[in-house]
């Protein structure tokens, strides 16, 4: 098989196999071919991973932030040296085109290790509080054992985005990738340990929806960070609340992208395409509700149709391919069902809408699809599709579009295209979302916080803000004089 790992799990610095677990077949989305067979973690494997993390964490926390950061930066260097190999593995794992993975996936993961490794000495400072004769100080301390639960759209990136801040704060992590994309996280574990990470600090176990509760409910776990769907997030948050665990949730969205009539039209079309078709539309922050001012709608749709139909769909390993398959057969069927709902509910199909005829019939392909004349009450405008389906809605005025954009249970992200920067700032101030873009879309460098509001989650990934979610403040009051007691 093309990508068979040494074993299913990586625990305490070594590969571990346990064939008692349910078989997980890793399928190449472009062909449906089995490229690896792994096993889900049994309860014994879960216990072993958490025990290793708990055992290793105190000594790691006692190291200086500089020493911890040095290891992460070394891991970043190794990832960059092996970018091509990691990118090819990511393409096999997800089906995303190699032209995407070589610039986006391992690269972003390496950036996370470099960023958090570099800010460790300065980012983990406390404060000094003068109190007259006395004083107090605060310090940031690690939480302990953290659990990371990944999604299947950016498996390597997500593993690094969670591991980097957790480790630099002095925690240990047990990471469970999606059963659809089990391979990348194992390579990240290898690289971290090659870079000098002590054993037991980053463990990877495979599993499905039955494995997550074993991790989330474990009494030795202090923190859970999930990237996934809203229903999964609700279940995990409810379980974590029972033991008062720290939680970060990066969930789904149905984000608005607003195009005003003074926008650079080609840039707006390009932004809408990036915000709907990159990674075959499997991006949580996608601006899938594209609100276009009526005066430019026809020209916007004309240019969008031409560019969408010119996209190259094909073999993800071909450097020319711009659109790959969905991650799984089930996801493709879900997307096709939403396209059919859009047609049935009266939306106008502008481009795509089916399965391309130039690819393997065994692959999980869907054409990039554009609907116009979409109304706010249509299913495709309300529910997260998580595929290459763009909904174009029209509007007249600013107040109107803001109210409609906010009329959603989600609040992950949003965007505005306009030449009027005063209006741009005014609009983003009123949009109910955690991450917003002006005259661009879906750029997420590790230097900036990323996360949502409302049903799209809470907490933040990346930037200095992430340190707050993998540590807690300890306050120390220092008395400098005799104790005065009334008794």
UniProtKB/Swiss-Prot annotation:
Binding annotation for NAD(+): 150-152, 176-179, 229-232, 252, 284, 384
Cofactors demanded by this protein: K(+)
Residues the record lists as binding K(+) 2: 244, 454, 457
Catalytic activity: betaine aldehyde + NAD(+) + H2O = glycine betaine + NADH + 2 H(+)
Active site: 162, 250, 284, 461
Keywords on record: Metal-binding, NAD, NADP, Oxidation, Oxidoreductase, Potassium
Sites of Cysteine sulfenic acid (-SOH) modification: 284
Pfam families in the record: Aldedh (PF00171)
Top enzyme category: oxidoreductase
Annotated binding of K(+) 1, by residue: 26, 93
Matches recorded under InterPro entries: Ald_DH/histidinol_DH, Ald_DH_C, Ald_DH_CS_CYS, Ald_DH_CS_GLU, Ald_DH_N, Aldehyde_DH_dom, BADH
A GO biological process held by the record: glycine betaine biosynthetic process from choline
Domain of life: Bacteria
Its EC number(s): 1.2.1.8
CC cofactor note: Binds 2 potassium ions per subunit.
Involved pathway(s): Amine and polyamine biosynthesis; betaine biosynthesis via choline pathway; betaine from betaine aldehyde: step 1/1
GO molecular function: betaine-aldehyde dehydrogenase (NAD+) activity; metal ion binding
Subunit structure: Dimer of dimers.
Entry similarity comment: Belongs to the aldehyde dehydrogenase family.
Function noted in UniProt: Involved in the biosynthesis of the osmoprotectant glycine betaine. Catalyzes the irreversible oxidation of betaine aldehyde to the corresponding acid.
Cited HAMAP family: BADH (MF_00804)
Name of the protein in its database record: Betaine aldehyde dehydrogenase
Organism: Rhizobium johnstonii (strain DSM 114642 / LMG 32736 / 3841)
Lineage: Bacteria, Pseudomonadati, Pseudomonadota, Alphaproteobacteria, Hyphomicrobiales
């Amino acid at each position: 098989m093309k990508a068979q790992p040494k074993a299913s799990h990586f625990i305490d610095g070594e590969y571990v196999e346990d064939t008692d677990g349910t078989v997980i077949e890793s399928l190449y989305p472009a062909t449906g071919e089995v490229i690896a067979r792994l096993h889900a973690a049994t309860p014994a494997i879960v216990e072993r991973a958490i025990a290793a993390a708990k055992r290793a964490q105190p000594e790691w926390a006692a190291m200086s932030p500089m020493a911890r950061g040095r290891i992460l930066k070394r891991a970043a260097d190794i990832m960059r040296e092996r970018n091509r190999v990691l990118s090819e593995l990511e393409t096999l794992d997800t089906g995303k085109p190699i032209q995407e993975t070589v610039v986006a996936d391992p690269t972003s993961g390496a950036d996370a290790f470099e960023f958090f490794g570099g800010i460790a000495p300065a980012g983990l400072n406390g404060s000094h509080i003068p109190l007259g004769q006395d004083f107090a100080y605060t310090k940031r301390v690690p939480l302990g054992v953290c659990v990371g639960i990944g999604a299947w759209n950016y498996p390597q990136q997500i593993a690094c985005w969670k591991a980097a801040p957790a480790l630099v704060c002095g925690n240990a992590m047990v990471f469970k990738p999606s059963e659809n994309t089990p391979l990348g996280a194992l390579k990240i574990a290898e690289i971290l340990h090659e870079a000098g990470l002590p054993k037991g600090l980053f463990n990877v176990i495979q599993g499905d929806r039955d494995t997550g509760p074993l991790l989330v409910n474990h009494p030795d776990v202090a923190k859970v960070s999930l990237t996934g769907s809203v229903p999964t997030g609700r279940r995990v948050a409810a379980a974590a609340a029972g033991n008062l665990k720290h939680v970060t949730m990066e969930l789904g969205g149905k984000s608005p992208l607003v195009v005003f009539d003074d926008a650079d039209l080609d840039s707006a079309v390009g932004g809408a395409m990036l915000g709907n078709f990159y990674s075959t539309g499997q991006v949580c922050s996608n601006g899938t509700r594209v609100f276009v001012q009526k005066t430019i709608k026809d020209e916007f749709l004309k240019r969008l149709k031409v560019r969408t139909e010119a996209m190259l769909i094909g073999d993800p390993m071909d450097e020319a391919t711009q659109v790959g398959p969905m991650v799984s057969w089930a996801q493709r069927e879900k997307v096709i069902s939403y396209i059919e709902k859009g047609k049935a509910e009266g939306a106008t199909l502008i481009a795509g809408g089916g399965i391309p005829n130039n690819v393997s019939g065994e692959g999980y392909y869907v054409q990039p699809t554009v609907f116009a004349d979409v109304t706010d009450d249509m299913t495709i405008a309300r529910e997260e599709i998580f595929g290459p389906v763009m909904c174009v809605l029209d509007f007249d005025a600013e107040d109107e579009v803001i109210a409609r954009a906010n009329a959603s249970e989600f609040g992950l992200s949003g965007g505005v295209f306009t030449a009027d920067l005063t209006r741009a700032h005014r609009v983003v101030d009123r949009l109910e979302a955690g991450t917003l873009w002006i005259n661009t879309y879906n750029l997420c460098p590790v230097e900036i916080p990323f996360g949502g509001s409302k049903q799209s989650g809470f907490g933040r990934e990346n930037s200095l803000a992430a340190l707050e979610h993998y540590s807690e403040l300890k306050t120390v009051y220092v008395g400098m004089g005799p104790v005065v007691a009334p008794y």
